[in-house]
């Protein structure tokens, strides 16, 4: 039992920290999984190196398998060509054309000779060759012109003739590739801009005698510049239609102050009518004021009573005392006047 325990693989990180923990069932549960000490760092680097070596081994095995398939491809293609010399229809997209010339000097061999000269070529090595691993290529020179490749890559542009045209022109079978017409090389860049007309008198000035590529600066004619004789000065601008003056929308006026060339903004739209006010609540019932005319007139004041109680205030008392004093002073004056008369 002790020997079995000793031979059981242990966790190296736990062993670095003084613990013996079996690896079985311990994956992802180590307490020192993120430890950065010197020994644990060496363990993590060793694990990275082992993973890289494993990836390299798998890539080498895949390359060996691809090399074996490439070696078997040409053998199978040559055996199939010898067994079936008749032309086999192959899609034009998978054909890689070469020059139709042969070592014997024939200018245009027949379709049988071209079909016999076909063989399958293995494309460049890659991880996934795909369904187009075997591509038939015409025999002869290995050099292919770019124009011929473009013509075969787009068979829809120059399709084979049908009916009487095919019989009259002697169009070959499906494997016979017509020689495409050579395109006339044109300039890389075509200038579609209108030619620039420059006055030779103004092309070069005395300041720059050697600057042939410099264009003069022609300022716009403004109102304060000297105008030639017979031309009125520009004193303002007004906006006119293009039919009156083809040079632009601004023309000069014979006189007047400067006028702005913008339009006044349109008047604002009229305001919508105000909504009617809600009816005010009536505190008096309708017809109440009209009923006031039918009320009886107020009764007349009562007649004065025979017995009246007069209440004299202090001010009234003072007024009565003054009146009594005046009456008393006026009474003795009357006999004196009588005496004077006697």
From Swiss-Prot:
The record's keywords, sorted A to Z, are: DNA-binding, Metal-binding, Nucleus, Transcription, Transcription regulation, Zinc
Q: Which GO terms describe its cellular component?
A: chromatin; nucleus
Disordered: region residues: 91-131, 245-342
What SUPFAM superfamilies is this protein classified in?
Cysteine-rich DNA binding domain, (DM domain) (SSF82927)
Gene Ontology terms describing biological process = regulation of transcription by RNA polymerase II; sex differentiation
Q: InterPro entries, from UniProt?
A: DM_DNA-bd, DM_DNA-bd_sf, DMRT
The annotated regions of Pro residues compositional bias extend over 263-284, 295-305
In Gene Ontology terms, what is one molecular function of this protein?
A: metal ion binding
Expression (tissue specificity): Testis.
Q: What is its main location?
A: nucleus
Q: Which PROSITE patterns match?
A: DM_1, DM_2
Q: Which Gene3D superfamilies match?
A: DM DNA-binding domain
**Bias-annotated ranges (Low complexity):** 331-342
DNA-binding region, residues = 11-58
Record's subcellular location: Nucleus
Tell me which family the UniProt entry assigns to this protein: Belongs to the DMRT family.
This chain's protein is named Doublesex- and mab-3-related transcription factor B1
Name of the coding gene: DMRTB1
């Amino acid at each position: 039992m002790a020997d079995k325990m000793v031979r059981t693989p242990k966790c190296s990180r736990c062993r670095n920290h003084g613990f013996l923990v079996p690896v079985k069932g311990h994956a992802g549960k180590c307490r020192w999984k993120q430890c950065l000490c010197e020994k644990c760092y060496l363990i993590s680097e060793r694990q990275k190196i082992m993973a890289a070596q494993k990836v390299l081994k798998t890539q080498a095995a895949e390359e060996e398998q691809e090399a074996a398939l490439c070696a078997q491809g040409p053998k199978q293609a040559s055996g199939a060509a010898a067994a079936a010399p008749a032309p086999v229809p192959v899609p034009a997209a998978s054909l890689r054309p070469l020059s139709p010339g042969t070592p014997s000097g024939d200018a245009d061999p027949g379709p049988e000779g071209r079909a016999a000269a076909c063989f399958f070529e293995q494309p460049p090595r890659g991880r996934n060759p795909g369904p187009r691993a075997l591509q038939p290529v015409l025999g002869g020179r290995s050099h292919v012109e770019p124009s011929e490749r473009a013509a075969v890559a787009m068979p829809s542009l120059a399709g084979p003739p049908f009916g009487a045209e095919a019989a009259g022109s002697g169009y070959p079978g499906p494997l016979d590739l017509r020689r495409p017409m050579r395109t006339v090389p044109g300039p890389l860049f075509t200038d579609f801009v209108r030619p620039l007309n420059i006055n030779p008198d103004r092309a070069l000035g005395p300041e720059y005698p050697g600057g042939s590529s410099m264009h003069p600066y022609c300022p716009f004619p403004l109102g304060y510049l000297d105008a030639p004789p017979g031309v009125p000065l520009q004193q303002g601008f007004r906006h006119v239609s293009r039919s009156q003056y083809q040079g632009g929308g601004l023309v000069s006026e014979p006189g007047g102050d400067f006028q702005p060339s913008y339009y006044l903004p349109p008047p604002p739209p009229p305001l919508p009518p105000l909504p009617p006010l809600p009816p005010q609540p009536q505190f008096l019932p309708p017809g109440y004021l009209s009923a006031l005319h039918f009320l009886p007139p107020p009764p007349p004041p009562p007649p004065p009573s025979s017995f009246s109680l007069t209440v004299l205030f202090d001010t009234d008392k003072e007024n009565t005392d003054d009146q009594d004093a005046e009456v008393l002073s006026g009474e003795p004056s009357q006999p004196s006047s009588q005496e004077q008369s006697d």
